């Protein structure tokens, strides 16, 4: 065994050739050397000469070969080398050391279409390529399927397992499989050479065309072949040769033991031959292998009851399909790696998380759906379906030999094959064509179904692959935690929803096998999940409770399913299968008109539905599911309370009203949709909720009573029509006029003329979407003034009035608004056809389909009160006519005004109404019934001329008054008969708006111009620098504008009255109370001044000039008689911050005049005009001055610290701290006395404490707004804020 290991490890594959078994190194036969560009010279090795050409040999035969290797002559050795080269070139050599170490094989797995012999790089077969290289494709095969080595690496096994089919195919085509005795006989090589020379089997055309030789016959390198080799190598490296059960996440079962039947992925012929070879040569017969997972077992070899292989196969992450035919959805994708705890069916989804479902379920049923009951049904339902399918499937599947292919059913034959969502549709197609028979048995199918029930995988073809004549195919439903990321071909694409005769006669009694139950919530959004078909009458009574809890059910289905399902009516499975839907609608013709949606009504009258309109039908059916409302059950007088639940419960009584015969003659047929079912159910519920939540009008007694009075009071109202009603032809409703009463709706000539004028005016005054906000337009989307408008006691008067649409925000139909407007504008010319006969066809116009239009196109007609003549056919309407003549003088005639709060009178509306009533004169040909229409408009609001025409919400008294009271914004109702005056009114309104906007723009522009002019400082150059530092008396005095700088005597102080924020660098920011010193006046609006050492400009209006007595000026010294001057020397440089401070340099001699206080001296520098005060700590006092005053300063201990304001310790006597001269205590002319306005607590040592009312003698006013002075109360000297005091003489 060790020798065999050495044999396997010593062989090296260089460019695809095995280096060995050639002869001694000295016998360098040029015919045995591969030459050419880029080739590698290969020499024959003297060792292991007798190794046979076919690499795999059994362990028992290997010693025999080695013993005979030394006995063979040179020629047979060369022939053996040629055989070995040919075998290695075609991928049948022993594994290389790299392969033994676990690396991937670089030998290609050739396709069945190109059985080329040598795709490797250097294309070397032998020197006799013209004779022998073509005669020796890899034909010799041992009985062993694995290499003769004890190092059984799984990668080696897999590589050999992948390479065997190609050689077996060629061996099967060209020569029978030889036995081991034949291969190991001494004369076997020469015998096969002679036999193959006689047969001269030619290689493929590609090999003949690609192989080129030189004059000696040595094959040259072919660049194209090299590229092909690289391509093949790349594909081989990235190819995943999965066995059928290697990927538990994507099951691909073969339901047959027939190994000729292809599996789900199209196999090459070599792979099929390998499957055949597995019958003859079993792997276990040749070499004992270590325990491997089931990924290396064939499908027939694996036990179906064996547990699933859960080992991670990393090859699937490198899997790439080589062609579109091998593409399998979900493979090598993120879905492969996703693991779910268990399968989720739509019944298990918590519908309470859906806001719309929670709201409407509570609104209609009073409590949420009992989901626990639904979930208990779901488990039993699936098991029952599987058992029934198994039972039904026994006889047909026994007769059907083909078990692994999906054949198209009659339901999908009309669809294009591209719609079939099968993971291997093309492969299935090929297999169904190329597999005439199989060995499928009932036991195999039964085991598959048991595996499914036990938690196993359902095949990708679905259970429909077993040719069962039951309902639609199912996906894997694994309740044990397995993956279920693949949806069968019938569950995702709704075009092939019924893939197995779902509508066929044999399976109408069965429910679909949970086709939409697996992972729908993980793949599709909640609103677009496919819904299940409705079960028929056999299973409906037990399982109908499951259907209302589906994820994507509409509100109509939630409340109608219990009623309609008992009649076997199928619910919608999605808007995209309308052909099947319409077919099932025709099968079940018993669907009532109240539950049949309007789009179905439209499509049934225009069959067959064209395929080009599928996209529109998708949206319309989905929209209808969300918005359809059944209004037939809400009869007048049947509701005693006004609660929302009571009102909503009456929307569900369509079947009762049909049974009572309360519908009109034109609404009795199942194919006709009554006009009162037009508006959206959700819209009505939103109206009820909005009314109950925010509007005070909850008195429905007038509208819900059987008295025709409120019905007749709405005679002037016009209907809000959707865009579809404008675009749809009237000939689609030929039978609607048959059911009309003899006394028509608009029997009154006043109303007829009014309608005629409104219709004629309609095209000239289109609805302007920009002038009305979207919320306003939403309110009047589906209001329909139907035929019961003028027949209060007739059969139409029993139905409720339609409420305004408030479908806002998330409504999908709101996005169709603009296109609907454009379609109406483009087709406005077509309206002239039915405008002429609007009186007769008025009812048919009201019966149009209101599906997708939240935006109405109202007839431009006033909503008002005017006299109306009662129809001659109905005498019960005469009180209503008399009531209409007197516009609501009696408070009892206002049923909707009761309970509403008083609204303040809109005086502006009445002024405008009065102006309109005087300015807009009606034409002479105006009907007499419209005398009061002139004052119907006020900024889009219907405002009658008197209080009697209004309810308490200032809305007209009509049956729609409550609905119009819900509107938060005005409506644009224009008198239909005043064409000219209306245009003038619109133009006048437009002009008024333009004038108002022009005035506002003008005022704004003037203000901006004034601001710009006021801040035009481009020519203003400040006389000083922006910032003034302590060095301003030095360098700043050297600038050219020194003359412009005013002295402290010339600068006038001013105080800021308001805060001023600078907007440019030239402006000086001020706070209220700041004292600024004005340098100059720039213009009549701006000053230039200084504040806190910064120079800038500020507005004149922001400051107030201080009186001349408050000028900041150097303090005139008191007439003090100096007896003896003192003397001091400066220790430091001192820069004065104010005008009274004296600056000096270190070392200068200073003459002391007097001591101001304990911290400051007053002095001058001899020989200069500089005089002022300075801190004591900055100088060394050599001699103190003597001043003749009534009270002299005592000798105070002064500190030599550099602090400018060193304070005496509190332990010193009070007299020593506050010793002042008598002229300080007496206000002199040189000092300004101020009175404190506020109290001030000192923050620093040199600050003065102030109390409200204190008198302070100010000696200095600093330019930063601080004053220096002495308090008369405390006799202390210090600084304090200037805005805390006021002049005493004021």
UniProtKB/Swiss-Prot annotation:
<dbReference type="GO" id="GO:0031625">
    <property type="term" value="F:ubiquitin protein ligase binding"/>
</dbReference>
<keyword id="KW-0965">Cell junction</keyword>
<feature type="modified residue" description="Phosphoserine">
    <location>
        <position position="270"/>
    </location>
</feature>
<feature type="modified residue" description="Phosphothreonine">
    <location>
        <position position="179"/>
    </location>
</feature>
<feature type="modified residue" description="Phosphoserine">
    <location>
        <position position="969"/>
    </location>
</feature>
<dbReference type="GO" id="GO:0045725">
    <property type="term" value="P:positive regulation of glycogen biosynthetic process"/>
</dbReference>
<feature type="modified residue" description="Phosphoserine">
    <location>
        <position position="209"/>
    </location>
</feature>
<dbReference type="InterPro" id="IPR036028">
    <property type="entry name" value="SH3-like_dom_sf"/>
</dbReference>
<feature type="compositionally biased region" description="Polar residues">
    <location>
        <begin position="704"/>
        <end position="722"/>
    </location>
</feature>
<feature type="modified residue" description="Phosphoserine">
    <location>
        <position position="204"/>
    </location>
</feature>
<feature type="modified residue" description="Phosphoserine">
    <location>
        <position position="1209"/>
    </location>
</feature>
<feature type="compositionally biased region" description="Basic and acidic residues">
    <location>
        <begin position="189"/>
        <end position="199"/>
    </location>
</feature>
<keyword id="KW-0677">Repeat</keyword>
<dbReference type="GO" id="GO:0046889">
    <property type="term" value="P:positive regulation of lipid biosynthetic process"/>
</dbReference>
<dbReference type="GO" id="GO:1904393">
    <property type="term" value="P:regulation of skeletal muscle acetylcholine-gated channel clustering"/>
</dbReference>
<feature type="domain" description="SH3 2">
    <location>
        <begin position="1123"/>
        <end position="1184"/>
    </location>
</feature>
<dbReference type="GO" id="GO:0005158">
    <property type="term" value="F:insulin receptor binding"/>
</dbReference>
<feature type="modified residue" description="Phosphothreonine">
    <location>
        <position position="1189"/>
    </location>
</feature>
<feature type="compositionally biased region" description="Polar residues">
    <location>
        <begin position="1211"/>
        <end position="1227"/>
    </location>
</feature>
<dbReference type="GO" id="GO:0095500">
    <property type="term" value="P:acetylcholine receptor signaling pathway"/>
</dbReference>
<feature type="region of interest" description="Disordered">
    <location>
        <begin position="238"/>
        <end position="271"/>
    </location>
</feature>
<dbReference type="InterPro" id="IPR003127">
    <property type="entry name" value="SoHo_dom"/>
</dbReference>
<feature type="modified residue" description="Phosphotyrosine">
    <location>
        <position position="1198"/>
    </location>
</feature>
<feature type="modified residue" description="Phosphotyrosine; by ABL1">
    <location>
        <position position="325"/>
    </location>
</feature>
<feature type="compositionally biased region" description="Basic and acidic residues">
    <location>
        <begin position="240"/>
        <end position="260"/>
    </location>
</feature>
<feature type="modified residue" description="Phosphoserine">
    <location>
        <position position="345"/>
    </location>
</feature>
<feature type="region of interest" description="Disordered">
    <location>
        <begin position="822"/>
        <end position="841"/>
    </location>
</feature>
<keyword id="KW-0813">Transport</keyword>
<feature type="compositionally biased region" description="Basic and acidic residues">
    <location>
        <begin position="161"/>
        <end position="173"/>
    </location>
</feature>
<dbReference type="Pfam" id="PF14604">
    <property type="entry name" value="SH3_9"/>
</dbReference>
<comment type="function">
    <text>Plays a role in tyrosine phosphorylation of CBL by linking CBL to the insulin receptor. Required for insulin-stimulated glucose transport. Involved in formation of actin stress fibers and focal adhesions.</text>
</comment>
<dbReference type="GO" id="GO:0030159">
    <property type="term" value="F:signaling receptor complex adaptor activity"/>
</dbReference>
<dbReference type="GO" id="GO:1903078">
    <property type="term" value="P:positive regulation of protein localization to plasma membrane"/>
</dbReference>
<dbReference type="GO" id="GO:0030055">
    <property type="term" value="C:cell-substrate junction"/>
</dbReference>
<feature type="region of interest" description="Disordered">
    <location>
        <begin position="286"/>
        <end position="313"/>
    </location>
</feature>
<dbReference type="GO" id="GO:0016600">
    <property type="term" value="C:flotillin complex"/>
</dbReference>
<feature type="compositionally biased region" description="Low complexity">
    <location>
        <begin position="1198"/>
        <end position="1210"/>
    </location>
</feature>
<dbReference type="GO" id="GO:0005912">
    <property type="term" value="C:adherens junction"/>
</dbReference>
<dbReference type="GO" id="GO:0005634">
    <property type="term" value="C:nucleus"/>
</dbReference>
<feature type="region of interest" description="Disordered">
    <location>
        <begin position="389"/>
        <end position="416"/>
    </location>
</feature>
<feature type="domain" description="SH3 1">
    <location>
        <begin position="1049"/>
        <end position="1108"/>
    </location>
</feature>
<keyword id="KW-0472">Membrane</keyword>
């Amino acid at each position: 065994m060790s020798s065999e290991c050495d044999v396997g490890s010593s062989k090296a594959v260089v460019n695809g050739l095995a280096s060995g078994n050639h002869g001694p190194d000295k016998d360098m036969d040029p015919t045995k050397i591969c030459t050419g560009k880029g080739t590698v010279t290969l020499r024959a090795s003297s060792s292991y000469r007798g190794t046979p050409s076919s690499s795999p040999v059994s362990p028992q035969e290997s010693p025999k070969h080695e013993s005979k290797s030394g006995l063979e002559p040179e020629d047979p050795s060369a022939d053996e080398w040629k055989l070995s080269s040919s075998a290695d070139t075609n991928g049948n050599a022993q594994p290389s050391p790299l392969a033994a170490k676990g690396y991937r094989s670089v030998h290609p797995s050739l396709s069945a279409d190109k059985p080329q012999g040598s795709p490797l790089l250097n294309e070397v077969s032998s020197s006799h390529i013209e004779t022998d290289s073509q005669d020796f494709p890899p034909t010799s095969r041992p009985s062993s399927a694995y290499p003769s080595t004890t190092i059984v690496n799984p990668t080696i096994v897999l590589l050999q397992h992948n390479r065997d089919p190609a050689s077996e195919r060629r061996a099967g085509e060209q020569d029978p499989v030889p036995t081991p005795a034949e291969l190991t006989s001494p004369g076997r090589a020469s015998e096969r050479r002679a036999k193959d020379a006689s047969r001269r089997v030619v290689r493929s055309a590609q090999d003949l065309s690609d192989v080129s030789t030189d004059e000696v016959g040595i094959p040259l390198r072919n660049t194209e072949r090299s590229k092909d080799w690289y391509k093949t190598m790349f594909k081989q490296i990235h190819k995943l040769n999965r066995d059928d059960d290697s990927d538990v996440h994507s099951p691909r079962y073969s339901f047959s033991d027939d190994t000729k039947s292809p599996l789900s992925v199209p196999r090459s012929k070599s792979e099929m031959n390998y499957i055949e070879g597995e019958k003859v040569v079993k792997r276990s017969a040749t070499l004992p292998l270590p325990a491997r997972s089931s990924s290396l077992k064939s499908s027939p070899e694996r036990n179906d009851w064996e547990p699933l292989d859960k080992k991670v196969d990393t090859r699937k992450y490198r899997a790439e399909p080589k062609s579109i035919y091998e593409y399998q959805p979900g493979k090598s994708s993120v879905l492969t790696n996703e693991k779910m705890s268990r399968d989720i069916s739509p019944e298990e989804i918590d519908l309470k998380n859906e806001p719309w479902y929670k709201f409407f379920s509570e609104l209609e049923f009073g409590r949420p759906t009992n989901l626990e009951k639904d979930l208990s049904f779901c488990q039993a339902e699936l098991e029952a379906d599987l058992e029934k399918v198994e039972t039904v499937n026994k006889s047909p599947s026994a007769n059907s030999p083909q078990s692994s292919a999906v054949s198209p059913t009659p339901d999908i034959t009309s669809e294009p094959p591209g719609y079939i969502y099968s993971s291997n549709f093309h492969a299935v197609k090929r297999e169904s064509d190329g597999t005439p028979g199989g060995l499928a048995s009932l036991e195999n199918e039964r085991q598959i179904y048991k595996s499914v029930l036990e938690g196993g995988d359902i095949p990708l073809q679905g259970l429909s692959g077993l040719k069962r004549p039951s309902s639609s195919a199912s996906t894997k439903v694994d309740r044990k935690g397995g993956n279920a990321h693949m949806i069968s071909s019938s569950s995702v694409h709704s075009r092939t929803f019924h893939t197995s005769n779902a509508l066929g006669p044999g399976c109408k009694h069965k429910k679909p096998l949970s086709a939409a139950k697996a992972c729908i919530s993980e793949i599709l959004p909640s609103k677009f999940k496919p819904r299940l078909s409705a079960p028929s009458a056999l299973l409906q009574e037990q399982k109908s409770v499951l259907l209302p809890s589906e994820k994507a059910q509409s509100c109509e289905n939630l409340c109608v399913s219990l009623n309609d399902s008992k009649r076997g009516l199928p619910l919608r499975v999605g808007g995209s299968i309308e052909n099947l839907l319409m077919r099932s609608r025709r099968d079940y013709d018993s669907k009532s008109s109240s539950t049949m949606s309007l789009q179905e009504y439209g499509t049934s009258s225009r069959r067959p539905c064209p395929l080009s309109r599928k996209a529109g039908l998708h949206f319309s059916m989905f929209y209808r599911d969300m918005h359809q409302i059944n209004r037939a059950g809400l009869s007048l007088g049947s509701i005693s309370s006004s609660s929302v639940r009571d009102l909503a419960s009456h929307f569900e009584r369509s079947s009762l009203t049909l049974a009572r015969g309360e519908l009109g003659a034109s609404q009795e047929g199942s194919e006709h949709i009554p006009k009162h079912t037009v508006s959206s159910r959700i819209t009505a519920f939103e109206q009820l909720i909005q009314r109950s939540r925010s509007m005070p009008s909850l008195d429905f007694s007038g509208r819900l009573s059987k008295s025709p009075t409120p019905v007749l009071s709405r005679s002037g109202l016009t209907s809000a029509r959707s865009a579809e009603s404008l675009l749809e032809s009237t000939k689609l409703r030929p039978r609607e006029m048959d059911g009309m009463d003899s006394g028509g709706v608009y029997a009154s000539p006043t109303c007829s003329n009014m309608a005629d004028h409104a219709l004629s005016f309609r095209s000239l005054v289109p609805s302007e979407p920009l002038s009305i906000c979207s919320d306003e337009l939403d309110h009047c989307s589906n209001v329909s003034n139907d035929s019961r408008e003028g027949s209060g006691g007739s059969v139409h008067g029993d139905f409720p009035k339609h409420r305004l649409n408030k479908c806002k925000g998330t409504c999908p139909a709101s996005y169709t608004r603009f296109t609907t407007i454009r379609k109406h504008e483009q087709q406005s010319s077509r309206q002239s056809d039915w405008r002429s006969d609007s009186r007769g066809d008025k009812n048919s116009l009201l019966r149009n389909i209101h599906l997708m239009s939240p935006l109405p196109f109202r007839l431009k007609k006033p909503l008002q009160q005017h006299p109306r003549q009662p129809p001659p056919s109905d005498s019960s309407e005469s009180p209503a006519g008399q009531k209409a003549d007197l516009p609501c003088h009696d408070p009892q005639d206002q049923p909707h005004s009761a309970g509403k709060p008083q609204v303040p009178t809109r005086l502006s509306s009445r002024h405008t109404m009065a102006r309109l009533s005087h300015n807009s004169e009606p034409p002479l040909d105006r009907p007499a019934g419209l005398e009061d229409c002139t004052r119907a408009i006020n900024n889009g609001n219907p405002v009658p001329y008197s209080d009697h025409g209004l309810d308490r919400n200032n809305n007209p008294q009509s049956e729609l008054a409550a609905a119009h009271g819900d509107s938060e914004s005005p409506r644009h109702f224009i008198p239909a008969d005043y064409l000219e005056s209306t245009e003038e009114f619109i133009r006048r309104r437009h002009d008024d708006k333009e004038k108002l906007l022009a005035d506002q723009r003008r005022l704004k522009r003037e203000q901006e111009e004034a601001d710009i002019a006021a801040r035009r400082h481009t020519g203003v150059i400040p006389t000083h620098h922006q910032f003034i530092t302590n060095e301003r008396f030095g360098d700043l005095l050297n600038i050219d504008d020194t003359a412009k700088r005013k002295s402290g005597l010339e600068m006038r102080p001013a105080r800021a009255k308001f805060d001023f924020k600078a907007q440019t660098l030239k402006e000086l920011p001020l706070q209220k109370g700041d004292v600024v010193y004005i340098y100059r006046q720039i213009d009549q609006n701006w000053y230039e001044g200084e504040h806190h050492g910064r120079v800038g400009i500020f507005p004149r209006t922001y400051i107030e000039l201080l009186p001349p007595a408050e000028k900041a000026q150097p303090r005139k010294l008191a007439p003090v008689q100096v007896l003896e001057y003192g003397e001091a020397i400066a220790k430091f440089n001192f820069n004065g911050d104010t005008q009274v401070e004296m600056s000096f340099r270190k070392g200068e001699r200073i003459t002391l005049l007097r001591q101001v206080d304990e911290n400051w001296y007053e002095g001058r520098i001899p020989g200069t005009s500089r005089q002022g005060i300075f801190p004591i700590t900055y100088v060394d006092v050599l001699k103190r001055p003597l001043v003749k005053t009534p009270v002299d300063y005592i000798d105070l201990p002064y500190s030599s610290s550099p602090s400018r304001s060193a304070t005496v310790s509190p332990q010193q006597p009070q007299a020593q701290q506050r010793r002042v001269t008598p002229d300080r205590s007496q206000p002199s002319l040189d000092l300004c006395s101020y009175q404190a306005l506020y109290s001030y607590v000192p923050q620093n040592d040199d600050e003065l404490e102030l109390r409200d009312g204190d008198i302070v003698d100010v000696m200095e006013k600093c330019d930063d707004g601080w004053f220096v002075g002495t308090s008369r109360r405390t006799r202390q000297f210090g600084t304090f804020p200037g805005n805390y005091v006021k002049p005493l003489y004021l």
